[in-house]
């Protein structure tokens, strides 16, 4: 290929008047080499086995998986060997560089290229051109489509590919096949293909293997990753224009890869003694439940999905981490994803996962990289500390072994890191049609997946969850589901999706009618095509919770009674507005110091501080206040390890009520005598189903009615958890109300509930990827053509989160306060406006985000809200565009009264109560 190095370019730029370029062959060689090194040093054993087993061998060539990965790297930019690409003007260079590179081509015999004016060069993007050329030269669709999609999106259909025939000049400069220049382009393109084949051990196109679709996705992701690394000029520098070749090619690849590679591949130990495993990892011996689980998994041959249903506080997290090591060893995984419902729960577990990661390293000199992935990860102090240490000397193990690799910190690459903690959205997006989706599949297919706090997922989110699990089944990736309150039909759907991904037909599975049992605790798992359940455990200590239905007008009396002679009273309600109203009322009566409030409408830094304060007050081993009222929304039920002496809650679906009950008498501590019996009060139960409007909007009448119907006067934990959840969510269990009008109201609510589910499922399917193709059929081809058709229109991470959760659009701003003639943070009385371009100050400011109330982001007014904010920022905060931390953000400055007028509303921020909103024309709260 030496002769081709002289004239085709892959990259070009200009730095300090130096004209730089990278010959196409050098970039292809770099990418091929990176693909080979990633195969050897980054891919998990399980991924390699998947690819090798997906190959339909056409020859006796060894290591066909690795060779195919390298071939893709070697040929991926063949579409750049076309006039359409070579005549492109550079984005970061003078015209002089463009001219000189075209002159190289002229001297090489491509006469007229300097003056060529193509009619439609953009119709033949080099990725599509690459697929078209490979197909033209005999490469099968399954491999050629990977090349066509290496910029993040495969072609939607063959029509788009076939249309390339209409642009012969884009490929050959001339439309006449017998012209010299046409033949010269053709012979050079063939030379690139033949070089790629020879370099990777294939004698001809006919020797290239056929490969199944799931493995195509992994190879596609691997190619994109290889290309991105090889395109990084810090790793692989460009050459001066007068250079045509790299002097020391082996040194170039070795140096470049070492600059990128900072962590070692995790190779899990094989433990025979499970007690030792727990002691070394967590510092304690396993409980009966944990030991039985690990012993069960140890006996399996080909495990896949494991569902753990057990009460709160039994140690499911440690059980999952121990089992993830066992599954990694059995299935050849080399990483972990731990997903939780919210940013707060992800933050809460990050330190524990980091410590486990440190412990699995043991006394080795291994270095492991870990990521915290959600919208507010930069606020997590533990993650920030790791970020500060990410420039450690990797040869010096004294400097720490768990760190953050910056290359994996981008939103497209974070899923590729070995150990990732984040919100469950990250996993749900495996099923969302998004550009560069193959990268996310590449990252998740090398890990054990743990999804914590899986309850009765919304029907919309379930579409993405079940599809993502189906793809994990196709990849043979272990999935661990943790839940305290899982409806039986949800358990069945999870298992069914995974088995379908494996290619196992549901009707062929024995004893499937047993899957919906209500035993508790319960382990459900597969071993190859068989499903098993474990329900025999050591009898657990029972805790009695007494349930009282509480009329709203008696709330004050119960709270006062709970405080008399000492006690911590918790109140969990379903809306922010109600929590604020209650907090104000009780503060007026009992004093500000007696009442704490937590919900999602605080400035982000304030919410995190409030969560920490709460854990210090009523968390494990906390020094508890003699008396306290703590009011909050659903954030209090989500993994905060807190303990109330008495708990009051709005009515909610049964599984969520039980989650809330999990915060009542959670720890074994000495309590005031009158609180020795656990009492749980439920607000908002109505015989006529006249539920609170805010609660109805959140949960719907149907589940509220069924929960109210089956809610007993006493719950025995943990024995009653599963039976109660199954009763509410088992729609086959019919209930009848004596009053005909009430029964009709219930049936109407059921119809509305069922319609809502159907609509949500239909809506979710719009941007959800299709099932993996395990076998070619007349309906579905064995390739990636059309895989991302109807791509989600917005590529931002925030929009993707909203899409997989079906969240209404919200507007987030950075909240500041007017100080003197400038502005500052609410927590500091200091004007920082003149130093806003200081990176330290800008980063601190960027952390103070606030989600505006929904009244400002309705379909009819969200555009106006954003337009007003943009005008305000252009006028008052234009300096932010000069800061990498603040560029693109929207800020608001509350006045001296903590007020801000926006789109016909007055916002008021209070450090105790959060943000509230009033409509200006009616002067009433919204």
Swiss-Prot record:
Its cofactor is Mn(2+); Mg(2+); Ca(2+). InterPro entries: Cas3-like_dom (IPR054712), Cas3_C (IPR041372), CRISPR-assoc_Cas3_HD (IPR006483), CRISPR-assoc_Cas3_HD_sf (IPR038257), DEAD/DEAH_box_helicase_dom (IPR011545), DEAD_box_RNA_helicases (IPR050547), Helicase_ATP-bd (IPR014001), Helicase_C-like (IPR001650). The keyword Cell membrane does not apply. Nuclease activity is inhibited by EDTA. One of its GO terms (molecular function) is metal ion binding. PROSITE patterns: HD_CAS3, HELICASE_ATP_BIND_1, HELICASE_CTER. Changing residue 452 to A: Loss of ssDNA-dependent ATPase, loss of helicase activity. CDD domains: Cas3''_I, DEXHc_cas3. Residues 17-229 form the HD Cas3-type domain. Residues 551-745 form the Helicase C-terminal domain. Mn(2+) or Mg(2+) or Ca(2+). ATPase and nuclease activities are dependent on divalent cations, for ATPase Mn(2+) is marginally preferred over Mg(2+) or Ca(2+). Coiled coil: none annotated. Keywords: Antiviral defense, ATP-binding, Helicase, Hydrolase, Magnesium, Metal-binding, Nuclease, Nucleotide-binding. The keyword Transmembrane does not apply. It is an enzyme of class 3 (hydrolase). Changing residue 316 to A: Loss of ssDNA-dependent ATPase. One of its GO terms (biological process) is defense response to virus. A motif (DEAH box) lies at residues 452-455. Proteins of this family have an N-terminal nuclease domain and a C-terminal helicase/ATPase domain. In some CRISPR/Cas systems the domains are swapped, in others they are encoded separately. In the N-terminal section; belongs to the CRISPR-associated nuclease Cas3-HD family. In the central section; belongs to the CRISPR-associated helicase Cas3 family. CRISPR (clustered regularly interspaced short palindromic repeat), is an adaptive immune system that provides protection against mobile genetic elements (viruses, transposable elements and conjugative plasmids). CRISPR clusters contain sequences complementary to antecedent mobile elements and target invading nucleic acids. CRISPR clusters are transcribed and processed into CRISPR RNA (crRNA). Cas3 plus Cascade participate in CRISPR interference, the third stage of CRISPR immunity. Found in the E.coli-type CRISPR4/cas system. This is CRISPR-associated nuclease/helicase Cas3. It comes from Streptococcus thermophilus. The lineage of its organism: Bacteria, Bacillati, Bacillota, Bacilli, Lactobacillales.
């Amino acid at each position: 290929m030496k002769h081709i190095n002289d004239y085709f370019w892959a990259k070009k730029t200009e730095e300090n008047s130096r004209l730089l370029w990278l010959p196409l062959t050098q970039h292809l060689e770099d990418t091929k080499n990176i693909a080979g090194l990633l195969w050897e040093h980054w891919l998990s054993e399980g991924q390699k086995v998947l690819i090798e087993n997906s190959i339909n061998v056409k020859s006796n060539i060894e290591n066909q998986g690795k060779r195919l990965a390298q071939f893709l790297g070697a040929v991926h930019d063949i579409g750049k060997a076309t006039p359409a690409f070579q005549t492109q003007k550079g984005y970061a260079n003078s015209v002089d560089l463009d001219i000189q590179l075209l002159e190289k081509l002229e001297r090489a015999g491509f006469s007229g290229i300097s003056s060529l004016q193509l009619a439609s060069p953009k119709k033949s993007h080099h990725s599509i051109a690459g697929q078209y050329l490979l197909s033209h030269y005999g490469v099968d669709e399954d491999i050629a489509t990977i090349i066509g999609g290496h910029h993040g999106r495969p072609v939607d259909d063959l029509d788009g590919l076939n249309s390339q025939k209409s642009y012969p000049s884009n490929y050959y400069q001339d439309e006449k096949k017998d012209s010299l220049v046409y033949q010269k382009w053709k012979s050079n393109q063939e030379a690139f293909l033949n070089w790629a084949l020879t370099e990777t051990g294939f004698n001809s196109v006919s020797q290239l293997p056929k490969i199944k679709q799931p493995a195509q996705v992994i190879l596609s992701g691997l190619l994109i990753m290889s290309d991105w690394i090889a395109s990084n000029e810090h790793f692989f520098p460009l050459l001066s224009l007068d250079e045509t070749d790299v002097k020391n090619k082996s040194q170039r690849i070795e140096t470049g890869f070492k600059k990128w590679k900072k962590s070692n591949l995790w190779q899990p130990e094989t433990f025979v003694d499970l007690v030792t495993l727990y002691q070394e990892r967590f510092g304690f011996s396993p409980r009966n439940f944990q030991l039985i689980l690990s012993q069960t998994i140890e006996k399996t041959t080909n495990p896949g999905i494991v569902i753990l249903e057990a009460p709160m506080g039994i140690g499911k997290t440690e059980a999952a981490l121990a089992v993830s090591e066992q599954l990694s060893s059995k299935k050849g995984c080399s990483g972990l994803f731990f997903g939780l419902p919210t940013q707060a729960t992800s933050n809460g577990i990050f330190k524990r996962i980091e410590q486990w990661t440190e412990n699995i390293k043991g006394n080795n000199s291994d270095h492991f990289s870990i990521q915290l992935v959600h919208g507010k990860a930069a606020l997590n102090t533990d993650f920030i500390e790791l970020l500060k240490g990410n420039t450690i000397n990797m040869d010096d193990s004294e400097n720490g072994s768990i760190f953050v690799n910056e290359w994996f910190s981008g939103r497209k690459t974070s899923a590729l890191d070995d150990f990732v903690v984040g919100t469950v959205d990250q996993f749900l997006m495996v099923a969302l049609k998004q550009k560069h989706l193959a990268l996310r599949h590449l990252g998740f297919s090398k890990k054990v997946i743990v999804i914590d706090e899986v309850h009765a997922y919304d029907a919309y989110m379930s579409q993405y969850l079940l599809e993502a699990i189906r793809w994990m089944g196709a990849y043979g990736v272990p999935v661990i589901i943790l839940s305290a309150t899982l409806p039986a039909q949800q358990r069945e759907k999870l298992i069914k999706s995974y088995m379908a991904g494996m290619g196992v037909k549901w009707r062929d599975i024995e004893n499937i009618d047993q899957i919906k049992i209500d035993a508790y605790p319960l382990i459900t798992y597969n071993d190859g095509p068989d499903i098993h359940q474990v329900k025999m455990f050591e009898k657990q200590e029972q805790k009695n919770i007494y349930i009282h239905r509480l009329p709203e007008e008696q709330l004050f009396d119960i709270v006062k009674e709970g405080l008399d002679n000492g006690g911590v009273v918790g109140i969990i309600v379903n809306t922010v507005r109600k929590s604020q109203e209650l907090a104000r009322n009780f503060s007026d009566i009992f004093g500000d110091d007696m009442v704490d409030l937590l919900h999602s409408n605080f400035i982000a830094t304030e919410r995190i501080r409030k969560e920490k304060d709460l854990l210090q007050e009523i968390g494990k081993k906390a020094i508890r206040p003699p008396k306290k009222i703590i009011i909050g929304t659903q954030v209090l039920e989500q993994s905060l390890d807190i303990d109330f002496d008495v708990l009051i809650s709005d009515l909610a679906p049964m599984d969520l009520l039980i989650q809330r009950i999990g915060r009542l008498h959670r720890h074994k501590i000495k309590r005031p005598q009158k609180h020795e019996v656990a009492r749980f009060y439920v607000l908002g139960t109505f015989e006529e189903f006249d539920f609170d409007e805010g609660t109805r909007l959140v949960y719907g009448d149907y589940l509220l009615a069924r929960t109210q119907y089956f809610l007993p006067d006493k719950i025995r934990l943990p024995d009653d958890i599963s039976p109660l959840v199954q009763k509410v969510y088992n729609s086959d269990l019919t209930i009848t109300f004596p009053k005909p009008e009430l029964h009709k109201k219930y049936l109407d609510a059921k119809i509305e509930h069922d319609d809502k589910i159907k609509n949500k499922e239909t809506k979710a399917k719009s941007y959800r990827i299709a099932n993996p193709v395990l076998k070619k059929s007349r309906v579905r081809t064995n390739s990636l053509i059309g895989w991302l058709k109807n791509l989600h229109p917005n590529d931002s991470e925030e929009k993707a989160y909203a899409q997989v959760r079906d969240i209404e659009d919200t507007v987030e701003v950075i909240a500041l306060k007017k100080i003197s003639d400038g502005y500052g943070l609410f927590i500091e009385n200091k004007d920082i406006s003149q130093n806003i371009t200081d990176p330290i100050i800008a980063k601190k400011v960027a952390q103070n985000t606030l989600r505006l109330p929904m009244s400002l982001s309705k379909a009819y007014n969200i555009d106006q809200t954003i337009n007003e904010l943009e005008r305000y920022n252009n006028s008052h905060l234009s300096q932010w565009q000069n800061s990498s931390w603040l560029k693109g953000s929207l800020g608001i400055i509350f006045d001296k009264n903590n007020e801000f007028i926006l789109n016909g509303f007055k916002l008021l921020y209070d450090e105790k109560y959060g943000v509230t909103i009033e409509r200006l024309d009616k002067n009433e709260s919204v």
